[in-house]
């Protein structure tokens, strides 16, 4: 292998440094539809399988509109179990838990079709349908309802109050009870939050989403140039609270109305609302938002500096190909060699910097390409016009 480090003089060595600017950078280059569908199918497979393990039988809730359908499934399952209704409760529970999410998404598909893009909506429709069908079928694997990575979250060790709740199909644990269950549920939330962030980032890179309220988050993010991670965290929290109240707070309280116990566990009391299920799902949502911003920094602004000998050629190429970067150019003098070098400076989005690097390397393989993250920016930037957007701004200001 040829050594790219070249000795210049004495102990001075020119060292070649290189690094990927974007996480999952290779996925950004997938433009063929069949490859995008393959990636979405793989993600949907694991989303459905792990959703059964980490959410359906743990008492946690998923993100977005899914949490509401999950809450309804748990509410219906509670009434069937508590009233001893002679129906196939497992099928009803699984169908509501997974398949109603597809129906709930219909208004959002219409919104996305007209407000975002047809391709985005169709890819999202594909992912929502496939992932929920995978989850529905995986929920029928024999014994999966009693498969836990850590402690068993449904078996009561002390009987009495906790056993009464579990017998009626309510997935709820309390702070005063088994610490083993609390720690297990905490790990479930942290792991699933991280995995969702990875899956979700890949889905967004392909230009799709998980459906539901994601359409609103994506639309607002595009319209206001806001980071999508924080927006997701907010809307997911609101939808989760609704699902939690329906599927856990209400069902848990109704299940013990006839039970005479201590004052800490009165129906509709604080213990039923501020449970580990609530706290750890909120924590999971925070992990999801933070890691989504990390893996998919769509609106992270950076300052790019390019030092090279062919800056004029790079400038002409960018202008001829309508690459809307606002450019500042000047000549600098090396402090050691006193040689003149040209410098190109621009402020842009991080995901655009990767494309800019490709353009620079077409004309100057030895140019120094430097990126500095910008925490605050006040002014305007250029962004290439698309079918969904209009051009923004006239010049950079940082």
Curated annotation (Swiss-Prot):
InterPro entries membership: DUF2179 (IPR019264), N-reg_PII/ATP_PRibTrfase_C (IPR015867), UPF0750_membrane (IPR051461), YitT (IPR003740)
Entry protein name: Uncharacterized protein MG432
Residue ranges that the Swiss-Prot or TrEMBL entry lists as coiled coil: none
Membrane topology (UniProt): Multi-pass membrane protein
Organism: Mycoplasma genitalium (strain ATCC 33530 / DSM 19775 / NCTC 10195 / G37) (Mycoplasmoides genitalium)
Record PANTHER family: UPF0750 MEMBRANE PROTEIN YITT, UPF0750 MEMBRANE PROTEIN YITT-RELATED
Disulfide bonds: none
Compartments it resides in: Cell membrane
Residues passing through the membrane, by range: 37-57, 92-112, 122-142, 186-206, 228-248, 268-288
Pfam family, one: YitT_membrane
Key words, A-Z: Cell membrane, Membrane, Transmembrane, Transmembrane helix
GO CC annotations on file: plasma membrane
Taxon lineage: Bacteria, Bacillati, Mycoplasmatota, Mycoplasmoidales, Mycoplasmoidaceae
């Amino acid at each position: 292998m040829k050594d790219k480090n070249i000795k210049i003089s004495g102990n001075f060595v020119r060292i070649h440094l290189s690094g990927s600017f974007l996480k999952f950078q290779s996925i950004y280059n997938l433009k063929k539809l069949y490859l995008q569908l393959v990636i979405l199918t793989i993600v949907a497979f694991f989303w459905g399988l792990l959703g059964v393990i980490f959410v359906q039988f743990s008492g946690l809730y998923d993100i977005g509109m899914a949490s509401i359908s999950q809450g309804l499934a748990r509410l219906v399952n509670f009434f069937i179990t508590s009233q001893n209704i002679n129906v196939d409760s497992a099928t009803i529970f699984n169908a509501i838990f997974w398949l109603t999410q597809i129906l709930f998404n219909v208004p959002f598909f219409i919104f996305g079709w007209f407000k975002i893009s047809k391709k985005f909506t169709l890819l999202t429709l594909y992912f929502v349908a496939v992932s929920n069908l995978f989850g529905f079928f995986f929920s029928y694997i024999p014994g999966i309802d009693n498969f836990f990575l850590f402690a068993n979250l449904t078996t009561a060790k002390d009987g009495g109050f906790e056993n009464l709740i579990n017998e009626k199909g309510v997935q709820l644990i309390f702070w005063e009870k088994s610490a083993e269950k609390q720690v297990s549920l905490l790990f479930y939330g942290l792991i699933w939050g991280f995995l969702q962030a990875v899956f979700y980032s890949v889905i967004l890179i392909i230009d799709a989403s998980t459906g539901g309220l994601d359409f609103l988050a994506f639309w607002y993010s595009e319209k206001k140039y806001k980071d999508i991670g924080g927006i997701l965290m907010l809307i997911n929290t609101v939808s989760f609270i609704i699902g939690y109240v329906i599927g856990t707070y209400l069902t848990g309280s109704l299940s013990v109305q006839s039970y005479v116990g201590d004052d800490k566990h009165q129906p509709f009391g604080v213990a039923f609302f501020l449970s580990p299920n609530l706290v750890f799902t909120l924590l999971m949502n925070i992990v999801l938002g933070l890691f989504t911003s990390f893996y998919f920094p769509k609106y992270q602004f950076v300052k790019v500096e390019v030092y090279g000998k062919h800056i004029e050629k790079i400038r002409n190429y960018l202008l001829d190909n309508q690459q809307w970067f606002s450019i500042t150019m000047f000549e600098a003098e090396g402090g050691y060699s006193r040689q003149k070098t040209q410098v190109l400076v621009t402020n842009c989005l991080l995901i655009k910097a990767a494309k800019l690097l490709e353009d620079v390397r077409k004309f100057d393989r030895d140019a120094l390409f430097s990126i500095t993250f910008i925490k605050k920016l006040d002014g305007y930037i250029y962004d290439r016009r698309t079918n969904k957007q209009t051009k923004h701004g006239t010049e950079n200001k940082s």
